[in-house]
């Protein structure tokens, strides 16, 4: 009798333990499903915001290049801003990304991309990586993007982010962008995302014949002109496109 009681008690304990494990497993599965649904809904929400951004901010203002529109429809801008700014990633304006720098207004990103008239086989140099967003947009269109960022923390963060998101055709370098990237030149197009007092000659020298460069030019801490420079038979022509505000072109400090 005592043996039977012990066996029954042990069996009851086993059943109880198994029941608890089943309950815990169900709770875990439920939690995972809820998390997956939450992430899915969040992604769907960002996808909708991105599509609305393209329609209301880009197409409505005259952006027509299909490659540019497609790139900005697919690049997750919210993943290129600080986490506490992600809800605002698709607003019609620039956003701070730290170190006194900003991610440009979506329309400006699209406009600068469109005027370069990029093709799939192009090699592009970007000066001023920032968050890496503009490089990601370019990477959706061309074969190779080389981008230089003078602020070390931003360069590292952008490099890691672009790698994590699968932009394998972007190469990030920490350094002074004024002198360009001679080892990777010449380039079909150059984009400068910081305001300079004048167009750096080394960048013009690194343009291919028929190449185009877009750069904000003007006095420090003032409204600048977005300038399109074209190179043909070693001659440079420039055209002012619009008035803009950009963070200043930062140079490497000279050692005394």
Stretches with model-predicted labels:
Residues 25-34:
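Sec-dependent signal peptide recognition
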Residues 34-41:
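Hydrophobic h-region of N-terminal signal peptides that target proteins for export
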Residues 1, 100-103, 149:
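Short, surface-exposed alpha-helical recognition segments that flank or form part
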Residues 41-125, 136, 141, 156, ...:
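Class I SAM-dependent transferase core
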Residues 1-25:
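N-terminal secretory signal peptides that target proteins for export/translocation
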Residues 255-256:
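Positively charged
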Residues 117-236:
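Conserved nucleotide-cofactor-binding alpha/beta core module
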């Amino acid at each position: 009798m005592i043996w039977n009681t012990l066996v029954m008690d042990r069996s009851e304990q086993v059943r109880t333990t198994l029941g608890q494990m089943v309950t815990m497993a169900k709770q875990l599965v439920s939690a995972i499903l809820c998390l997956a649904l939450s992430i899915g809904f969040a992604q769907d929400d960002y996808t909708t915001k991105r599509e609305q951004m393209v329609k209301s901010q880009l197409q409505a203002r005259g952006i027509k290049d299909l490659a540019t529109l497609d790139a900005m429809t697919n690049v997750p801008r919210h993943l290129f801003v600080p986490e506490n700014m992600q809800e605002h990633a698709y607003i019609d304006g620039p956003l701070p990304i730290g170190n006194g720098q900003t991610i440009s207004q979506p329309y400006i990103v699209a406009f600068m991309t469109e005027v370069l008239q990029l093709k799939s086989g192009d090699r592009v140099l970007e000066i001023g990586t920032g968050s890496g967003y503009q490089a990601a947009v370019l990477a959706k269109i061309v074969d190779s993007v080389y981008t230089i960022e003078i602020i070390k923390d931003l360069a590292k963060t952008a490099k890691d982010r672009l790698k994590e998101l699968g932009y394998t055709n972007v190469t990030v370098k920490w350094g002074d962008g004024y002198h360009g990237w001679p080892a990777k030149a010449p380039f079909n197009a150059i984009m400068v995302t910081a305001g300079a007092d004048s167009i750096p000659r080394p960048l013009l020298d690194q343009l291919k014949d028929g190449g185009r460069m877009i750069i904000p030019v003007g006095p420090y801490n003032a409204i600048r002109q977005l300038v399109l420079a074209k190179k043909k038979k070693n001659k440079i022509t420039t055209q002012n496109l619009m008035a803009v505000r950009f963070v200043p072109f930062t140079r490497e400090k000279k050692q005394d």
